[in-house]
Amino acid sequence: MIIWISSYPKSGNTWVRSFLSAYYYSKDGNFNFELLSNIKQFPSKDFSRRKVLSVDDASKNWLVAQKEIVSKKKIFFLKTHNIYGAYKGNKFTTPEFSIGQIYIVRDPRNVISSLMNHYSIGEKEALDMICSPYRNLKDKNDVEDYSSYSFISSWANNYKSWKNSDIKNKLLVKYEDLETDTEQSFIKIIKFTNNLINNSSDVDKNKIKKSIENTNFETLKKKEKIEGFAEAILDEQGNKKTFFNLGKNNNYKKLLNISTTNKLEKIFNKEMKELNYI
């Protein structure tokens, strides 16, 4: 069965994956980027036996690939930015394959500045991206292969789709809580996942502290600078963009035009109020 680590892009998914990798896949809470291979991105080439030639083809492969995953009779963590929904009648996932989900949500005003750096786009284009109900993602390096195709829709649609999913076990995590109450937030995540994987052992608070220490933003940023980061995307010149970029310095009040924040607060008013962002 699958436990989804889901989010709109640049909302803290990699942080949560890194922490879970350090906690569950190391002996002492130490972390290296190779551990992330234990929590793969879905969809991706890792789950396709052949070249996927179109969006339609990609969507038809979603459940086929997941059926093969769950046939292994193990529980897998998978990362995704896809919405919980369907494309032309092809469902992304179902409760049949999904034992639980952790959805990470982040204030869209701070998501925008991260999108700008990550995708080398301007403020207007980032605003258009986060508001578009038709937005999708595909690995730039795979020009003719749609294995990695993800339909992410808008920030609000992405959030609502997972919030309202019919997966039985759900946990909503706010990025802001990860920043301000890190230890308690990750303890909550571990208690949730331990229950799903039938791990009856007590939460190892020492290992949690070590995992947090080894996956905090500054540590990951230093590791990326020294070692590089395989998941960083390429800019137009073919150079890898810095993945761990701003961290706590990502403050929309200092980085965005007031007109952009006003538009976001108007377009996403209902969801932002629901999440106490406004």
What are these regions (language model features)?
Residues 183-187, 232-245:
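Short, compositionally biased low-complexity segments
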Residues 204-214:
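Acidic/histidine-enriched alpha-helical segments
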Residues 212-239:
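Short acidic/His-enriched helical or mixed secondary-structure segments at domain edges of catalytic enzymes
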Residues 185-186, 203-204, 278:
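Composition- and surface-driven signal marking solvent-exposed, interaction-prone regions
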Residues 1-173, 238, 242-278:
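PAPS-dependent sulfotransferase catalytic domain
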Residues 31, 198-206:
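Acidic/polar loop patches that form or flank catalytic/metal-binding clefts of enzymes
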Residues 12-26, 172-199, 211, 219-222:
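PAPS/PAP-binding and catalytic site of the sulfotransferase fold
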